[in-house]
From Swiss-Prot:
Pfam families given in the database record: Kinase-PPPase
NCBIfam families on file: PRK05339.1 (NF003742)
Keywords: Kinase, Nucleotide-binding, Serine/threonine-protein kinase, Transferase
Amino-acid positions noted as binding ADP in the UniProt annotation, renumbered to this chain: 147-154
EC number: 2.7.11.32, 2.7.4.27
Single GO MF annotation: phosphotransferase activity, phosphate group as acceptor
Family that this chain belongs to: Belongs to the pyruvate, phosphate/water dikinase regulatory protein family. PDRP subfamily.
UniProt-recorded name of the protein: Putative pyruvate, phosphate dikinase regulatory protein
Amino acid sequence: MKRIYVISDATGETAERVIRAALSQFYYDEVRVVRLCQIHNENDVQQAMSVAIAEPGMIAYTLVDPSLSQKVAQLAEDHGMYAVDLLGGLIYSLSCFLGATSQAKPGLLHRIDTDYFKRMEAVNFTVTHDDGQDTQYLHKADLVLVGASRSSKTPLSMYLAHKGYKVANVPLIIGIDPPVELFQIEQEKVVGLVIDPKRLVEIRTSRLINMRQSPRGNYADYQRVEDEITSCRRLYRQHPQWMVIDMTNKSVEEAASEILRKMAVREKRITEARVKGDIS
């Protein structure tokens, strides 16, 4: 059984993924990847290398401190072990290309990796909770968007998901009660979308034409659309804790920015109230 030692100043998870991706190119199963992590000084390097030297193998390291990288390389050479710097060459090349000095902060690679997987998890959640699907899991959402059909619920949900927020959206339809779960979750999570009826008629008409369907019917009828928006506004007034966003002539990016800004203000207010002891 051959061993590959991953020496990292963070968790080593990203480096291990790189190693395993490279290993997948070989028909060789008898390899064990051993992580030696949180290496922050020469004493840590010495201890990690002692483990590797006891059962020699290949060294793969990601250390942003050049002196520690050099120490690992020297010890590996002294004991006849292969060693590869997974990060140093790239950082040096980027430094030359950008004309800038690296931050040399341990763990940034892992943080970026973690952020990526958080976004992917949010996107997956949002896709599976689009248009009123699986409402029994609304409590797991960071935000729940509600509104009439074609009020930008889905594109806004996906935009926020790519920023790492788990978003569900629920359509509001005249004559059909919203799912009971909507009123059982934390109400500050709910965002009600409104839009000018004339603008919504234009959007729905365009949608029908693109689908080669007749725009004549209730879906794009002005009175019907106006009734839908009136019904939405009535529901929002009954739930003052809900945030309300007007989507009329507003881009998805602008709406998302407004939501996140209001969320930040709300969180700050709640935090200040807790500090003062006004709420538990």
